[in-house]
Amino acid sequence: MRNIHLFTVAVVLCLATAVSSAQTKSAKPKTPVMREAFTLRLKVDKDHSEEFHYDKQPYVSENEVYLFSGDKFGVNLVVKGDRVVEVSYQPNVSKADLVFGFEQPKELQNGVAMALTIDNKIKRDVTMEAMGSIPGKKDAFKDNIAPVKAGKSSTEFWPHPIAQLVLGNFRLTTEGTASPKK
């Protein structure tokens, strides 16, 4: 009888610990994966380059993707209904829903222009908004990214250098339109 009582107490304690642990884990906000401090070198005109130093920066934070020249990584989307509710960093591009490549190709406008390539590996079209900082300009620019078709790739070009590009407001779109499906 005493053994049954001890066994019951042990089971109750284990369950209480498991529930407490699960509540603690779900209550903790997700900490973004950070890239180490780095120096970015960008070509700003035909003959000149500039360096920009950044402290630790997230790859993804609060459903926004932070890109710098030379980046190539993926994200996963959590979709509920027809809405993107979460964007998370995925370093393994083979497991990512979207893969981003951001670069300053030498062959574009004397190496000054920027190119963003997006590979969409999900079964829905995706669109997003961009905001970026241009060296020497005080204000950030805003842009809409053309919808990337399901299972396809798309490339966006800008004729100027971009020190940092932030992508946000990820939306699923219906065929032939950039507005979210309701």
Please place each PLM-identified region on the residue numbering.
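Bacterial N-terminal signal peptides that target proteins for export
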Residues: 1-8
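Sec/Tat signal peptide C-region and signal peptidase I cleavage site
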Residues: 18-22
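Short, well-ordered beta-strand segments enriched in hydrophobic/aromatic residues
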Residues: 114-120
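Bacterial N-terminal signal peptides
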Residues: 8-16
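Intrinsically disordered, low-complexity segments enriched in small/polar residues
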Residues: 23-114, 125-127, 131-182
